Amino acid sequence: MIEAKTDPMIVSMGPHHPSMHGVLRLIVTLDGENVLDCEPVVGYLHRGMEKIAENRTIVQYLPYVTRWDYLATMFTEAITVNAPERLANIEVPRRASYLRVIMLELSRIASHLLWLGPFMADLGAQTPFFYILREREMIYDLFEAATGMRMMHNYFRVGGVAADVPYGWIDKCLDFCEYFLPKVDEYEALITRNPIFLKRVKGVGTISPQQAINWGLSGPMLRASGVSWDLRKVDRYECYEDFHWSVESEETGDCLARYLVRIREMRTSTKIVQQALKSIPGGPTENLEARQLSQGRTSPWNEFDYQFLGKKASPTFKMPRQEHYVRVEAPKGELGVFLIGDDHVFPWRWKIRPPGFINVQILPNLVQGMKLADIMTILGSIDIIMGEVDR
């Protein structure tokens, strides 16, 4: 029997393909339907976010950061204010910390919802997409009532939040939580045991725990591989230790495990929001003192180098000559900022550690030997946003 030998075919997927989740290009080498190699090409959405940060004060830079991961903007704002707060040792009032946690967890739910809808659409299931957008709109209505904006919120400030939530907002948010928990059960009833869905995701794109650690993966990608690592438990930032919740993880490390982790995280986030709303303390929502110089009150000379501000944190807030790495558990993984201050209003160095950029690097490893159709499944399960990958 004579075997016909064919040359490998090179296919360029993207950068404008709808299932690329942004301007990502994949150069795929195929032997028939089988993937021999895959090379991601990133950088189409690079805007120089790190260099912009080094030429702006923190207050000026805050509106820019919502353009990294534009579907989970609360987290990019949180990391931007947390870095100078830790560097200058600025305390955040308890009420502001609770409000931050509520906003962060609502943002996590919205991000996971907008991951689930397109992921199912990539697999050919269009129906869940419309249900998911219905709930996401409700979260955006809550954001609009509290911050004035549906997406680019610009709500976090150095030392607190921009404003307290309006009258009746807490009750409305509690009503949403009561409404949303049964909806997650509805998604699971629609999706989880569907035989077509299971054939597309079970055993596809498997990552072992050791692989996940070696590649530096974080977030649901890491927890789906059996590594129970969540920065909300590890670093205990904001006031997460005040609430009762557990880290969601799976053992199999495939696309199904990543789906299950995110579905359960939506439930966990809703329960954290409920606890925070029921036990939110009174008091100010912003720390109205900012340290102008690194000495603070302990200066042996006088009190002039410690500045009390009547209103907002000053745009001339100086960052001490120190360096610090700050991280938060974003919906896609560990979002970090390495900040070097220089006794100046501008940061000397502002290095962003985006989870999407780290997580997408394992993609060529996962798709080798798989079918062409599995690329969409695996890429969708990673959950990337190109604004954050390219910065």
Swiss-Prot record:
Pfam families: Complex1_49kDa. It catalyses: a plastoquinone + NADH + (n+1) H(+)(in) = a plastoquinol + NAD(+) + n H(+)(out); a plastoquinone + NADPH + (n+1) H(+)(in) = a plastoquinol + NADP(+) + n H(+)(out). It is found in: Plastid, Chloroplast thylakoid membrane. One of its GO terms (molecular function) is oxidoreductase activity, acting on NAD(P)H, quinone or similar compound as acceptor. Its EC number is 7.1.1.-. GO terms for biological process: photosynthesis, light reaction. PROSITE patterns: COMPLEX1_49K. One of its GO terms (cellular component) is chloroplast thylakoid membrane. NCBIfam families: PRK06075.1 (NF004739), PRK07415.1 (NF005649). NDH shuttles electrons from NAD(P)H:plastoquinone, via FMN and iron-sulfur (Fe-S) centers, to quinones in the photosynthetic chain and possibly in a chloroplast respiratory chain. The immediate electron acceptor for the enzyme in this species is believed to be plastoquinone. Couples the redox reaction to proton translocation, and thus conserves the redox energy in a proton gradient. This is NAD(P)H-quinone oxidoreductase subunit H, chloroplastic. It comes from Nephroselmis olivacea.
